[in-house]
Swiss-Prot record:
It comes from Cyanothece sp. (strain PCC 7425 / ATCC 29141). Disulfide bonds: none annotated. SUPFAM superfamilies: Ribosomal protein S7 (SSF47973). This is Small ribosomal subunit protein uS7. One of its GO terms (cellular component) is small ribosomal subunit.
Length: 155
C-alpha cells in the first residue's frame, strides 16, 4: 500500500427509480456474481410487496436501516498476551454498512418463497423493531456494554 496519498471514497450514485443512495447501496449489497439486474429486481420486488401492504416502501426501508444501525461495537485488541474485546463507537458510514449487511444476511436465512418476499418481511420486521437484524444490533450493544471495563484500551 502506498503511503503517499489518501484514498478518496467514491460517491455512490443514487438509484434511478427512487433517487436514493441508500437503495443503490442495498442493491450492491444484495448483488451476487455481478448480476446487478437480478439484485435490482429483488429490491424492487420487495418494495412492491411492502407497497401492497399499504406502506411507503422507501420510508419503511429507511426506518429499517435506521433501527438496525449499531452505535457501538467491540473490536479485539491484544494487550500483553491477552485479547480484550474493546468497545468502540461506530462511524455513521460503517453503521449503515453493517445494517445493510445484516438485513441481507438475515433475509437470506429466512424461510420463504422468493428472496424479494424474504427481504420485504425482514425490512418490515426491522422497521417495527423486531426480527433477527434488530436482535443482532441489540446483541452487539450488549457485548459493548459487558466489555465497558476495557474501554480505556481504545485505539
Amino acid at each position: 500500500m502506498s503511503r503517499r496519498t489518501r484514498i478518496h471514497k467514491r460517491t455512490i450514485p443514487p438509484d434511478p427509480t427512487f433517487n436514493s443512495r441508500l437503495v443503490n447501496m442495498m442493491i450492491r449489497r444484495i448483488m451476487l456474481s455481478g448480476k446487478k439486474s437480478v439484485a435490482t429486481r429483488i429490491i424492487y420486488g420487495a418494495f412492491k410487496t411492502i407497497e401492497e401492504r399499504g406502506q411507503d416502501p422507501l420510508e419503511v426501508f429507511e426506518r429499517a436501516v435506521k433501527n438496525s444501525t449499531p452505535l457501538v461495537e467491540v473490536k479485539a485488541r491484544r494487550v500483553g498476551g491477552a485479547t480484550y474485546q474493546v468497545p468502540m463507537e461506530v462511524r455513521p458510514e460503517r453503521g449503515v454498512a453493517l445494517a445493510l449487511r445484516w438485513l441481507v444476511r438475515f433475509s437470506r436465512q429466512r424461510s420463504g418463497r422468493s428472496m424479494a418476499q424474504k427481504l420485504a418481511n425482514e425490512l418490515m420486521d426491522a422497521a417495527n423493531e423486531t426480527g433477527n437484524t434488530i436482535r443482532k444490533r441489540e446483541e452487539t450493544h450488549k457485548m459493548a456494554e459487558a466489555n465497558k471495563a476495557f474501554a480505556h484500551y481504545r485505539y
